[in-house]
Amino acid sequence: MKTGIKHILIILALMVPTACSDWLVLIPPQGLIREEFWQSKEDVEAVVMGAYQEFAAMDELLFKYGEIRADMVVGDVNQGNDDRKVAEGNIYSDNSLCNWNQFYTVIDYCNEVIKNAPEVKKVDNTFTDYAMNGYLSEVYWLRGLAYFYLVRVFGDVPYITEPTETD
């Protein structure tokens, strides 16, 4: 029994120093790393399209914020409790429809393009000033539209112009 414990302790003693190493690099599950992503005009276009897609996914939510609150839609017995709260003017945090996450995801995508598109232009010779300015114009407009809806629905909201720095 003592020799078995000795063997286990020796094996553990040999394994512990190799368990932690400086060469260990964690890669995000999505497989994309910020330093490797912003390399071409296609990367810029992908983020711009992602911002549009995220905004388009909010269509039902934007409808509810406008039409239900304006009394333009009549509920029925199948109307959810959160819809009823919006109709009553309850746009507080206890209502699951009143979530800023999608708006700020769009804003973050736009901020990423605003920050990184000029850097991509330096490394991608096919990325022209014309194309870059077109993408920048789109994301400035889209970010402004997101803030327009946020302010219209919720009033004062945080104004963020820098992208998040996480992978």
Regions found by a protein language model. Name each.
Residues 1-29:
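Bacterial Sec-dependent N-terminal signal peptides
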Residues 20-67, 92:
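Membrane-proximal, proline-rich intrinsically disordered regions
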Residues 20-27, 79-83, 157:
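Short, compositionally biased low-complexity segments
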Residues 29-33, 89-91, 126-129, 161-167:
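Short linear capping/connector segments at secondary-structure termini
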Residues 45, 53, 81-154:
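Conserved, well-structured interaction surfaces
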Residues 69, 75-85, 90-91, 162:
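A structural signal for short, hydrophobic/glycine-enriched beta-strand patches
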Residues 152-162:
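Short, well-structured active-site flanking segments
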